[in-house]
């Protein structure tokens, strides 16, 4: 998202303020229809990762056919990106944790991922009914980045991939074990962890979240 600016203008602004993008976003359709174009865009930004945050599906009906199609597209696009030194990462939103055979649809994705990894959004993992730390233990080599977003206490999750942005709270003040997740991810060599806050209180909350992260003792 370039906030309405032309890409060249946006990149100039990043350069002016010495902001170096680690990752850029790409839609499912972009990866399906023009993965080479996605790779070139990432190279223009100097990004090492491309993240896709949504697999299209009708309403709340996400199933194994959607999952298999996505895995095929991600593996194909990921191979093209990999040739340019770029890693493709999928950002799960919780609807992937529906039961499938002896696990979940997410398990199918993780076990068949040849050319893509995971950007773990700890809010959506939790909201979808899974435990981020358990998932890090189960797939230690699959996670390459984290979105750190805490969930207000008392909120009950589901696997729709939908929740009010106002349920985003200061890191460490919600129901998610942010400290434990950060420590586990650090132990596993995850280098990039991004604070994400989509609430209307973001300006006030992010400094507090950053202060909380700085208070975590990493050994």
Identify the residue ranges that each predicted region occupies:
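Conserved beta-strand positions in the central sheet of alpha/beta enzyme cores
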Residues: 1, 23-25, 51, 89, ...
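Glycine-rich, proline-tolerant flexible connector loops at the mouths of alpha/beta enzymes
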Residues: 1-15
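Active-site-proximal loop/turn and secondary-structure-junction residues that shape catalytic pockets
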Residues: 2-3, 27-30, 56-58, 94-96, ...
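Short, acidic/polar
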Residues: 6-9, 32-42, 128-136, 178-181
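Active-site acidic/histidine proton-transfer and metal-coordination neighborhood
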Residues: 8, 20, 28-118, 203
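Conserved, mostly hydrophobic/aromatic
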Residues: 14, 42, 88, 121, ...
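Acidic/histidine-rich catalytic cores of soluble enzymes
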Residues: 81-175
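C-terminal helical cap(s) of enzyme catalytic domains, especially alpha/beta-barrels
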Residues: 202-219
